[in-house]
Amino acid sequence: GIPVCHNICPCLIDKKTPPWTQVLSACLTSFEGKSLELPDETNFEISKPVDEKMFLELCGHLYLVDDEDRTEWLDNLAADLEVILDLYSLMTWDDIRSCIQNGFSIGSHSYTHRNLLQVKESEVLEIEISFSRQRILDETGIAPSVFAFPNGLYNDRSLKVVEKSGYSIALLCDDKPANIDIINNSDGLLMLPRINICRTNWREEVLRSSGLHYHLKRITNPR
């Protein structure tokens, strides 16, 4: 079967650095404007309170921006808003080992949580995928079998590195259920879809998790 799995980015633990999504969340808590100018010079409308659906939509926009540009933009935004991050709330390797002792499996979510579609250098791709697996093995004694693509973004090149690195399951964000044919197919496990739960409307989430929402979208928008 597919294990209950907590997917981590080892670099964030090694460097005690919060993920950029946590920095963004802290910034939005302090932000009082009605729109944000993003690094690509587009404007994103903000309404308070910022719910999870809006937050994920904003993350989706920012994830398509070059990693260095996004980091610089967030650093400037956090400085302008005088945001102070609670670094004590970040997980440590001791916490990860405790998770394993309590029945969790640990998977990789890449080394630094960058957009793998933007990675051109083979060495960087190896670090994000293969070295990430090695770091988890070094710290826990268990080589992870699961790789969760950051934001579900992947291509043939990154998928081949995942398979070569020894992972047997790769998680996407296609927002559709995985049927039994996929689960029973070893190749299908390397492109396993998932459904993101936003906790905004429980009725909609029931439809999405059942697969009905996905099939209705395919009927109304076959492209």
Where are these regions (language model features)?
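Extended, charge-rich helix/loop segments that form flexible
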Residues: 16-102
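N-terminal-biased segments
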Residues: 51-53, 110-116
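C-terminal active-site subregion of NodB/CE4 polysaccharide deacetylases
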Residues: 1-4, 15-38, 44, 101, ...
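Short, basic/glycine-rich phosphate-binding loops at helix/coil junctions
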Residues: 73-76, 106-112
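Short beta-alpha junction loops
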Residues: 8-13
